[in-house]
Design a protein with these regions (language model features):
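Histidine/acidic-residue-rich, glycine-tolerant segments that coordinate divalent metal ions
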Residues: 21, 50-61
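Active-site ligand-binding patch in enzyme domains
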Residues: 2, 56-59, 63-194
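Zn2+-dependent cytidine deaminase-like catalytic core
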Residues: 1-50, 135, 159, 163-166, ...
Length: 194
């Protein structure tokens, strides 16, 4: 833990924005610092900014689930596609750039097979600079993923969660670099809670 390095370095005062929610640590570092004579001060005003900066970590530690941010584009009347099912750009350039900025912050982008079949999205970050592409995750109960889908060609890794045990299709997807995870629930759908 970092508290040992701080003690060994002879640091006299540590100002923290938030207590580490990791149950393996659970604030024990503060106790060790204080026991070693280090003055520990909490800066509560910076706590919210710290939580926002590390929201995914805090969600995993406190709730045991990843932080999920949903992005959807709809017209003023709440429609996401034309009446014939055709998809078209609803948002303008500024909104798309904002969406890509949020996408760049994500570890993974999740979609369902319906979106892949209807829109054939790329789901990668294109409009902002990023050091890495988020992992693409597709929930596909029946393993309907087309072998020419853009998500299989994207620079980020693609993971497909399915309830299907279709070995030939699994092998074909794996040959294209996808990871296929079979996780059926009792109803034969993908076990999202697992």
């Amino acid at each position: 833990p970092c508290c040992h390095a701080l003690i060994e370095a002879g640091i006299a005062k540590v100002v923290c924005a938030i207590t580490d929610p990791n149950p393996q640590v659970a604030g024990n570092g503060f106790a060790k610092l204080r026991a070693a004579g280090v003055h520990v001060e909490m800066d509560d005003a910076a706590g919210q900014a710290c939580r926002e900066l590390n929201i995914g970590f805090f969600s995993r530690m406190v709730r045991g689930t990843p932080w999920v941010r949903m992005k959807a584009a709809t017209s003023l009347d709440g429609v996401t596609a034309l009446h014939n099912g055709q998809s078209q750009w609803i948002t303008g350039p500024a909104a798309r750039a904002d969406g890509h900025a949020w996408r760049a912050r994500a570890c993974a982008i999740l979609t369902g097979i319906g979106t892949v079949l209807q829109d054939n999205p790329r789901l990668n970050v294109r409009e902002v600079q990023t050091p890495r592409q988020p992992r693409i995750v597709v929930v596909d109960s029946k393993l309907d993923m087309p072998l020419d889908a853009h998500v299989l060609k994207a620079p980020g890794a693609c993971t497909i969660y399915t309830s299907s045990t279709n070995a030939p299709k699994t092998q074909a997807l794996q040959a294209l670099g996808a990871t296929v995870v079979v996780m059926p629930n009792a109803a034969g759908k993908v076990d999202l809670a697992a």
